[in-house]
């Protein structure tokens, strides 16, 4: 499989290199769908200029990236395009090997359950085969590298790509069972954009499975391992934050980065749900509604952990999607990361109810973003309501699509144990309904 992956990487790099050299690069780098106040390359350049002048990059209200990022590009500014292409390639490679290992685990678990006669007798068509799973890692790499969202994000030099790489390596190290490296990469991802802290739960659940430790409140081994992983994660995060302080000799980055993410002071339009509401809202209501909006990212973690404790990788997929929808400053690069996982769940396709309609909604909205932006900002024949309407439709489409995958996953799991052909007590055919 190395040759096909190498071919995909070559094609992806070629496409990016061609776009970097085209006149479109400048246009893409200014698109509000592709960059946000957090991830904009122009803001990174501004921060670097301030740093070169001996001024704190956080002294103004422009730069909101982490200190490690600004020091990374302080040395690699001349190779920025190459850095972003390598970043995308590393993300795809990490996802490739992560899913390759995950498929092996899935197949072994399926084989064991078949031997233990845990599946219903009429579900042979739901059983996954090695041939069916063989090309899934390559498809994942393909879905990530050649996704237009990923390409646009790379060409715009959005720092969202770096966050995607950190999350991809967190997934890889978690699936490999490396507790320490998993904690480090999760800490780096949290340090970068804060929201990946919610991935702690699925990461812990998967590592518990790898260690054959039951997820039981009364289990001593469960609490010991959870404490160890939490301490590794928190310790790594503290070390990274302290390193940032030593680089800048200042704590200014904490309110400038994390305060900015949580308080949402910059209402530049984007593909998220925050900007329009807070632009229209009275100032004295804003704190309450900021809390209401922010809690969405964290609120679903506990119920999902309870429902999907036996399926932590699917839980991780859902949680990444929730982050990309409900974070304060989302971009299409965030959407591209969870979309890369669609081939992993191709066995759910038969149970998806509205996938065609929802895919059309997402594609059409993606095409209408620049049209309605032009009508609003340049032509003056539309207003912010038009742009926010398409943004809202785009996010509703994503929410319904992820809900559809969640329903399909639960439905397949139920059929595996209860059989495909369900009957009611009176012998008539029954229908499975999610409540």
Curated annotation (Swiss-Prot):
Report the Pfam families cross-referenced here: PIG-U (PF06728)
> What is its membrane topology?
Multi-pass membrane protein
Q: Which UniProt keywords apply?
A: Endoplasmic reticulum, GPI-anchor biosynthesis, Membrane, Transmembrane, Transmembrane helix
Gene Ontology terms for molecular function: GPI anchor binding; GPI-anchor transamidase activity
- Name recorded for this polypeptide: GPI-anchor transamidase component PIGU
Its gene name is PIGU
Provide the primary localization: endoplasmic reticulum
Q: How does it assemble?
A: Heteropentamer. Part of the GPI-anchor transamidase complex, consisting of PIGK, PIGT, PIGS, PIGU and GAA1.
The protein's job, in short, is:
Component of the glycosylphosphatidylinositol-anchor (GPI-anchor) transamidase (GPI-T) complex that catalyzes the formation of the linkage between a proprotein and a GPI-anchor and participates in GPI anchored protein biosynthesis. Binds the lipid portion of GPI-anchor. May act as an organizer in the transmembrane layer to recruit other subunits, and thus is essential for assembly of the complex.
What family name appears in the similarity comment? Answer: Belongs to the PIGU family.
Q: Record-annotated residues binding a 2-acyl-6-[6-phosphoethanolamine-alpha-D-mannosyl-(1->2)-6-phosphoethanolamine-alpha-D-mannosyl-(1->6)-2-phosphoethanolamine-alpha-D-mannosyl-(1->4)-alpha-D-glucosaminyl]-1-(1-radyl,2-acyl-sn-glycero-3-phospho)-1D-myo-inositol?
A: 383, 385
Q: Which InterPro entries match?
A: PIG-U (IPR009600)
Organism whose genome encodes this protein:
Cricetulus griseus
Q: Where's it found, cell-wise?
A: Endoplasmic reticulum membrane
Q: Which GO terms describe its biological process?
A: attachment of GPI anchor to protein; GPI anchor biosynthetic process; GPI anchored protein biosynthesis; regulation of receptor signaling pathway via JAK-STAT
List the record's Gene Ontology CC terms alphabetically. Answer: GPI-anchor transamidase complex; plasma membrane
Superkingdom, according to UniProt? Eukaryota
Q: Which residues cross the membrane?
A: 4-22, 79-99, 137-158, 159-178, 179-194, 195-205, 223-244, 287-306, 312-331, 332-345, 355-372, 385-406
Cytoplasmic compartment spans? 1-3, 100-136, 206-222, 307-311, 346-354, 407-435
Q: Which residues bind a cardiolipin?
A: 216, 309
Q: In which pathway does it act?
A: Glycolipid biosynthesis; glycosylphosphatidylinositol-anchor biosynthesis
